[in-house]
Amino acid sequence: MKIDLVKAAEKDAELIHRMQVESFREIYLKYKDDETNPINESVEKIVQKLKRSDSHFYLIKFENDFVGGVRIVVKNDHKRISPLFVLPRYRNKGIAQAAISKLEEIFGAENWELETISAEKINRHLYEKMGYRLDGKATIINDKLTLVFYRK
């Protein structure tokens, strides 16, 4: 799978916002999560994240189109993926897996963490296939949604 990660800038905040809304809409409707779902992030909040010195936001490019995004927060030698998203029409093509592999080439393959929805088996399978393991922590967001935490 050939993808490129293009470093996002402040000018990309509206594009990121539109892609997040489209990418997370189905999850939002399913779990009614007003607290943590990126669909609720404003463009201004995305700009703030883009400006942070510990934050690296990338647009995922596939066949000349931006098809998603991923943000990495680096603290010391620990890296956290939050969020990773691919537009619905580009899913199940290996794009997220290719993006994670590229990130590990850029930032190193160790000391990663992320969270995902416990009930989303496709996401969990992806992360486990990439070598991530549950760390035993979980956070209940509401009666429909529990987040589980992974490390690598």
What are these regions (language model features)?
Residues 45-59:
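A short helix-loop-beta-strand connector motif used in the catalytic cores of GNAT acetyltransferases and
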Residues 59, 65-73, 80-85:
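Conserved beta-strand in the GNAT
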Residues 3-18:
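A short beta-loop-alpha structural element at the N-terminal edge
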Residues 105-118:
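Conserved GNAT acetyl-CoA-binding A-motif
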Residues 81-82, 92-103:
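Glycine-rich acyl-CoA binding loop
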Residues 84-91, 116-118:
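A short, internal acetyl-CoA/4′-phosphopantetheine-binding micro-motif in the GNAT/acyltransferase core
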Residues 97-98, 102, 119-136, 142:
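Conserved active-site alpha-helix within GNAT-family acetyltransferase domains
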